[in-house]
Curated annotation (Swiss-Prot):
The lineage of its organism: Eukaryota, Metazoa, Chordata, Craniata, Vertebrata. It comes from Rattus norvegicus (Rat). Residues 106-128, 756-765, 778-834 have a biased composition (Low complexity). Residues 17-47, 734-755 have a biased composition (Pro residues). The chain crosses the membrane at residues 189-209, 214-234, 262-282, 291-311, 343-363, 414-434. Activated by cAMP, and at 10-100 times higher concentrations, also by cGMP. cAMP binding causes a conformation change that leads to the assembly of an active tetramer and channel opening. In the absence of cAMP, the C-terminal region is thought to exert a tonic inhibition on the pore when HCN2 is in a non-tetrameric form. Channel activity is modulated by intracellular chloride ions and pH; acidic pH shifts the activation to more negative voltages. This is Potassium/sodium hyperpolarization-activated cyclic nucleotide-gated channel 2. The modification Phosphoserine is found at residues 119, 134, 641, 726, 743, 750, 757, 840, 842, 847. InterPro entries: cNMP-bd_CS (IPR018488), cNMP-bd_dom (IPR000595), cNMP-bd_dom_sf (IPR018490), Ion_trans_dom (IPR005821), Ion_trans_N (IPR013621), K/Na_HCN_channel (IPR051413), K_chnl_volt-dep_EAG/ELK/ERG (IPR003938), RmlC-like_jellyroll (IPR014710). The segment S4 is the voltage-sensor and is characterized by a series of positively charged amino acids at every third position. Thee ion-conducting pore region is between segment S5 and S6. 3',5'-cyclic AMP binds at residues 581-582, 584, 591-592, 632.
Amino acid sequence: MDARGGGGRPGDSPGATPAPGPPPPPPPPAPPQPQPPPAPPPNPTTPSHPESADEPGPRSRLCSRDSSCTPGAAKGGANGECGRGEPQCSPEGPARGPKVSFSCRGAASGPAAAEEAGSEEAGPAGEPRGSQASFLQRQFGALLQPGVNKFSLRMFGSQKAVEREQERVKSAGAWIIHPYSDFRFYWDFTMLLFMVGNLIIIPVGITFFKDETTAPWIVFNVVSDTFFLMDLVLNFRTGIVIEDNTEIILDPEKIKKKYLRTWFVVDFVSSIPVDYIFLIVEKGIDSEVYKTARALRIVRFTKILSLLRLLRLSRLIRYIHQWEEIFHMTYDLASAVMRICNLISMMLLLCHWDGCLQFLVPMLQDFPSDCWVSINNMVNHSWSELYSFALFKAMSHMLCIGYGRQAPESMTDIWLTMLSMIVGATCYAMFIGHATALIQSLDSSRRQYQEKYKQVEQYMSFHKLPADFRQKIHDYYEHRYQGKMFDEDSILGELNGPLREEIVNFNCRKLVASMPLFANADPNFVTAMLTKLKFEVFQPGDYIIREGTIGKKMYFIQHGVVSVLTKGNKEMKLSDGSYFGEICLLTRGRRTASVRADTYCRLYSLSVDNFNEVLEEYPMMRRAFETVAIDRLDRIGKKNSILLHKVQHDLSSGVFNNQENAIIQEIVKYDREMVQQAELGQRVGLFPPPPPPQVTSAIATLQQAVAMSFCPQVARPLVGPLALGSPRLVRRAPPGPLPPAASPGPPAASPPAAPSSPRAPRTSPYGVPGSPATRVGPALPARRLSRASRPLSASQPSLPHGAPAPSPAASARPASSSTPRLGPAPTTRTAAPSPDRRDSASPGAASGLDPLDSARSRLSSNL
């Protein structure tokens, strides 16, 4: 047979000679099957093994293993050749598809072939012998291996690691049980039930029941002892977890040696069927000896006290703790519940044992006259009444609250009482210690805050600070940490980048939602900004920014109200979602206004270095900031050569395309028009005396740059100079026609412009229609303000959401210029509104008219 036939290999029989003569004739075809092709001539290098044609070889055995192949198709030539025939299918058995039959002849040689032939013998029905047994073995073997579930993935890290652990179990040997397998889980749970039953029932049975030969008692002992003996055997085949390095031992020899050195003796002694020995020996014991032999029942009770049972209970508690983690329970809650349950269970179990011991000792002494049972005449009472009195006596001793109904009189009772007190005091101290540690661990952040504040109090006492200073420090800590202290930088620093960004975005979600700059910007830009923010808290009266100092930070208001103050005693309120101090991040100049906290303020600060670092990755945002800042400085008569040189260099080098330059110019134009509109709104007598027009902030208009940089398609122009498709930037058209006075073009006459002061501030308070700063007048009551109309910045309040953006053609204002006019407004425009105008304004506000339209109406009536 050649090597392809599988019946033999060259070199199997070195002494054989090639078969001479012509090739043998092909075998006769079988009647029910098609004729197989003729066999090829024998290979001269292959030795011939003439055997019986009816003896199947390895290939024929392989063929006969499938019930769909006929045995007749597996026969080959006379010299052991193999030929491939047509697919042969048998109508009997389940449909498995056509099988390709091999015509083989010749016996296999060698031990490997014999082993293969022996393992592939077919049964009478064509199925391999032992296939059903192999299936059951595979299923049971899977129970002995760790499954792919949440617990195993958490323990081993990945599915591939679990598969490697499964291969370890397979290679360790037959019937090796993994400690994290499903079989061990169910077995430990079953042993828990038997263990609890033994810990509770056996002491009661030994102490309060005299007849131990009843059927229920025998059945309970037989079943429990059988399971304990089975557990003893399974412990030799169960892997051992090394707690130090989390290694799992699966080698049978190592498991046996370690188990024999540790808990085998205790487990073996506790699993001996002592009750069976009592039943056998009791038949040959007379009544006089039986009384002394009854003391042997203590052996059964000592088995309950085996440390192995308590160790299994603690192991089950660890399993429960792991299950609670799998079911997404919090760590503190799970550990607290399990520790409390363990302590309560141990206390109750010890009280139960002590109560049984209080009655067991007098019973072994045949109830002497000075024992508590004889004194109370309770010898013949029911076992439930005796157990209740004994348990009450034991708990009184263990809790150190008394001696029970009467003090001990006999020496035995005295020693039992002292033993109960010692055990009870120890358990009570352990319970108090664990409970105290448990309470502290449940609120470690509050405990850390209290420890920190104690140091602060000692510091204040050492420096003898006044009482008002101490109260301010106390209030600061209360509002800054709110009774809990965390090392937030350390916690966030230990997380990976994506998770840290998600947490920062979640913590600042209210800030992002309340700021148009963040709400319309690129998410990557917003994330980069948020990760640089630092949380700060200021008390009422604290000056967050002082005028004349160098600007190193800008602030975003999360909660609170601040006042922006200038040397001209002008004041403007900023609240949640506003920000201030932004221009100094670009110019690195000095502050032009002071900012004071009116309430407790929770702010996020951004340093100039971090801000510039973020802008390095977004040049479009930097260019927009710089261009608007230059235009604002030019309008107040100031220049910054560094910013001017950078912008001119960008224009000359062509860094930005025409579309981006057009967007930036539109932002500058929109910024100018917002300043002029704010100036116009302040000259309607809403905020007497009329403040000078101020310069807007770059950040208030950068939301449009962000939106257009990522969405160049500009929405249809509505009313304002620039309207984007963003829902936060669209200015809706007014519901009614504009007043007649608001005609296109500048007014016929404009007031003379006052000379601008060289010390005009770069960040000064002013208001626009709809901002809190301009709604304090009698014409627009403050109670009709909406939160959406709050100012966005210390230097640029925002228009109210939903209000129409005024355009140069639709606004009655003087002609625009690069530098706004400064100085007082004409007296005709600052006159106090008449009662008629006030009455006319109220219905408009009540009917839903926009505040900006109301201001325009009053302005037209003045004109």
